[in-house]
Amino acid sequence: MEKRKDTKTTIVKSSETTKSWYVVDAAGKTLGRLSSEVAKILRGKHKVTYTPHVAMGDGVIVINAEKVRLTGAKKGQKIYRYYTGYISGMREIPFENMMARKPNYIIEHAIKGMMPRTRLGKKQLKSLRIVKGDSYETFESQKPILLDI
């Protein structure tokens, strides 16, 4: 048997990577499906040259954060919890209240749960921008590409 010559594994260095920015519209999209696709882009898994230990992911700008949706009865059942640090300080906020107060947090929380809990994961998460509304003029210098998910 002759050995194939195109089966070499390439390890990409961080200096060899290029970072591009994408705009994702969350209007009418399901929260989990949107979050998993965005997490994949942030990690760089959509690239052919994906290397797990290199921060090679792209940046993502999510617009229309307040128009994301949940399926089934989760709209009335989903609860966000946090602890204030004081005795009896456990706070619970239903999805609908959180959507009215902080729609950006809902998407950020979902994407953060899909990222690795390491230093690299935190670095990759810094490339995420979530915007309420459909205006992203503040990020025009990144020359973002509209991505349909």
From Swiss-Prot:
Similarity comment text for this entry: Belongs to the universal ribosomal protein uL13 family.
Protein's GO biological process: negative regulation of translation; translation
Pfam entry (one): Ribosomal_L13
Annotated keywords: Ribonucleoprotein, Ribosomal protein
One cellular component (GO) term of this entry: cytosolic large ribosomal subunit
Function (record text): This protein is one of the early assembly proteins of the 50S ribosomal subunit, although it is not seen to bind rRNA by itself. It is important during the early stages of 50S assembly.
Matches recorded under Gene3D superfamilies: Ribosomal protein L13
Official protein name in the record: Large ribosomal subunit protein uL13
SUPFAM superfamilies assigned: Ribosomal protein L13
PANTHER family named in the record: LARGE RIBOSOMAL SUBUNIT PROTEIN UL13M, RIBOSOMAL PROTEIN L13
Assembly mode: Part of the 50S ribosomal subunit.
GO molecular function, one term: mRNA binding
